[in-house]
Amino acid sequence: MFSKPIFVAEVALSHDGSVGNACALIELAKKYNVDIVKFQDHWARYESSNQEKFRINIGLDKTRYDYWKRTEFTIEQWNYIYKFAKKLNIRLGFSIFSEQSFHRQIKLGNKIWKIGSGELLNEELIEIMLQNLGMEDTVIFSIGLSDFASGLRICKKFSNVVKK
């Protein structure tokens, strides 16, 4: 277990699809002694379609697919970001939203995961994570506006798989 508070910088998609912005945000987090920089790894073609509209439009993107496509990184770009973070001795963590994003982050060596309230009920993704994570992985749960009992039930499932 952790013996001191862990500070996480929630970058999510604030990089706006720019590797340079992502690296600048990692540098800023390092400057303020953040322990983990947490991104979202969306992969548009597995998580959306051109027909999926925004609840509230953001910027010039017409659909959620357009937004995620514009802000997603390739495995090569993520690899560059990982190497950049490693040079600064800062850890990365990820929220993932599809099996494909999960396996991409596994290939890159990710060991820190956040399951947000929107994914707590994604039983398929939860099962894939339970089958593939190990004692060296850390899972952060954000129950948010979800039913607390449901969130606790999911957390207990992971307690047999991961150490932290």
What are these regions (language model features)?
Residues 12-14, 40-44, 97-99, 118, ...:
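Active-site beta-loop-alpha junctions enriched in small/polar residues
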Residues 24-42, 108-109:
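Catalytic domains of carbohydrate-active enzymes, especially glycoside hydrolases
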